[in-house]
C-alpha cells in the first residue's frame, strides 16, 4: 500500500481490485493467485522508480478515465485519474464507484468530478508554494459527451438525474480554473488506473507516468 500511494502508481489498479476481496469469505484462490502475480511483478520491477523533473516552469496536467460496469458482480465502474508536473506523476487514484452508474458518460462525469476535486487542491498547494499555474490546468478526458455537457452548461433528459455536485469540472471550467480537453483512449494515461492493459501498453503508460529504471541491475525480464 505504501508503494502504491507514494512511488508506484502502476500498482494502483491491481491493488484497488484486490482490495475488494479482502473481507473474510470474499476471497478465493483466483484472488490469491492474482495477489502472487502482483508480488512477482513487483519483484521483477523493484529497480523501477518515480522520477520527477522536466520543464523549468510548473505546468499541471491531468488525465481522468472510467471503465463502465467492469465489476460484473456489483455492476459498478472503475474510475481513476493522474496529475503530472513536468515529466512525473505527482498524484493518482484508482477507485470503484460507490453506486451503479447508468451510462459511460455518467461514469466519466463522476471520474471527472473526482479529478477536478484533486486538481483544485493541487492548485491551492502550488499557489501556497509560490508556483500558482499561469494558465488553467488541462484535464484530459476521452468521453466527448462528458466534455460537451461541461462546455454547453445544460442538462438533457438523459442526464438530469446526475447529481449536480458531480459537475465540479464544469464549474471550475466556467471560473477559468480548468480546461477540459479530449484525448484518445490510446493516449489517455489514466487508462492504467481503470483496466488491465496489454504488457506493451502498460509499459508505455508507466514511462509516461515517470516510472523509469533507477536501479537497472534489479530489473528482470
Model features per residue range: what roles?
Residues 1-48, 184, 192-194:
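C-terminal reverse transcriptase regions that engage the nucleic-acid substrate
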Residues 40-66, 131-133:
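Structured nucleic-acid-interacting core domains from mobile-element enzymes and related host factors
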Residues 44-48, 69, 89-92, 121-128:
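Conserved helix-loop functional segments at active or binding sites
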Amino acid at each position: 500500500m505504501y508503494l502504491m500511494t507514494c512511488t508506484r502508481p502502476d500498482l494502483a489498479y491491481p491493488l484497488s481490485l484486490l482490495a475488494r476481496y479482502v473481507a473474510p469469505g470474499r476471497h478465493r484462490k483466483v484472488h490469491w493467485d492474482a495477489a502472487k502475480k502482483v508480488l512477482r511483478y513487483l519483484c521483477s520491477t523493484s529497480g523501477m522508480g518515480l522520477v520527477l523533473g522536466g520543464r523549468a516552469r510548473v505546468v499541471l496536467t491531468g488525465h481522468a478515465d472510467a471503465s463502465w460496469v467492469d465489476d460484473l458482480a456489483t455492476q459498478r465502474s472503475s474510475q481513476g485519474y493522474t496529475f503530472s508536473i513536468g515529466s512525473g506523476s505527482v498524484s493518482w487514484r484508482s477507485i470503484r464507484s460507490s453506486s451503479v452508474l447508468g451510462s459511460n458518460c455518467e461514469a466519466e462525469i463522476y471520474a471527472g468530478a473526482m479529478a477536478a476535486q484533486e486538481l483544485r487542491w493541487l492548485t491551492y498547494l502550488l499557489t501556497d508554494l509560490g508556483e500558482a499555474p499561469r494558465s488553467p490546468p488541462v484535464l484530459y478526458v476521452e468521453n466527448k459527451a462528458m466534455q460537451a455537457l461541461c462546455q454547453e452548461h445544460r442538462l438533457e433528459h438523459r442526464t438530469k438525474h446526475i447529481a449536480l455536485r458531480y459537475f465540479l469540472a464544469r464549474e471550475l471550467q466556467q471560473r477559468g480554473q480548468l480546461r477540459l480537453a479530449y484525448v484518445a483512449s490510446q493516449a489517455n494515461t489514466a487508462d492504467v488506473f481503470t483496466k488491465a492493459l496489454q504488457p506493451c501498453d502498460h509499459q508505455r503508460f508507466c514511462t509516461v507516468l515517470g516510472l523509469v529504471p533507477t536501479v537497472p541491475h534489479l530489473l528482470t525480464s
